[in-house]
Amino acid sequence: MAQQKEHQQESEFLERLVAVNRVTKVVKGGRQFAFAALVVIGDGKGKVGYGYGKAKEVPVAIQKAMDQAKKNLVTIALNKDTLQHAITGHHGAARVFMQPASEGTGIIAGGAMRAVFDVVGVKDVLAKCQGTRNPGNVIRATINALTSMATPEKVAAKRGKSVEEILSHVQ
């Protein structure tokens, strides 16, 4: 019964395994091998989180990454199935550029960025990654950019204008 509830709770999130690496710790007696997993989860409706887990076995590393990702969930304000406006983000040497796309465009993004867009619920976006292609840094840069995205309501409140005035300048 408890396993069934746990499985039901897990299924509410979309999960993407982005990378699995074999890592080594050199000690006096030789090398100790372990595995590191990078995972992105989301609900497909604007929530996304990432996690990084290390263990001696791959499944354990993935489970640790999933648990960490569930603790790091953030909410993204989407505009239907795309972004609110063009944004950039960076983390380390990774720089990401994203802009909304018209309906039917699809996800034009590569590598780790595509996994983030899949699980967050973005269906139409144009994105480019420059600098390092390190999956961990690209995911962090993408999520940093998405969380900094402002809704028209936030912009209107900040400027002391109505939402209609803000949206009239966009079109």
Curated annotation (Swiss-Prot):
GO terms for biological process: translation. Gene3D superfamilies: 3.30.160.20, 3.30.230.10. InterPro entries: Ribosomal_Su5_D2-typ_SF, Ribosomal_uS5, Ribosomal_uS5_bac-type, Ribosomal_uS5_C, Ribosomal_uS5_N, Ribosomal_uS5_N_CS, Ribsml_uS5_D2-typ_fold_subgr. Pfam families: Ribosomal_S5, Ribosomal_S5_C. Keywords: Ribonucleoprotein, Ribosomal protein, RNA-binding, rRNA-binding. GO terms for molecular function: rRNA binding; structural constituent of ribosome. GO terms for cellular component: small ribosomal subunit. Residues 13-76 form the S5 DRBM domain. Transmembrane segments: none annotated. Belongs to the universal ribosomal protein uS5 family. The N-terminal domain interacts with the head of the 30S subunit; the C-terminal domain interacts with the body and contacts protein S4. The interaction surface between S4 and S5 is involved in control of translational fidelity. Part of the 30S ribosomal subunit. Contacts proteins S4 and S8. With S4 and S12 plays an important role in translational accuracy. This is Small ribosomal subunit protein uS5.
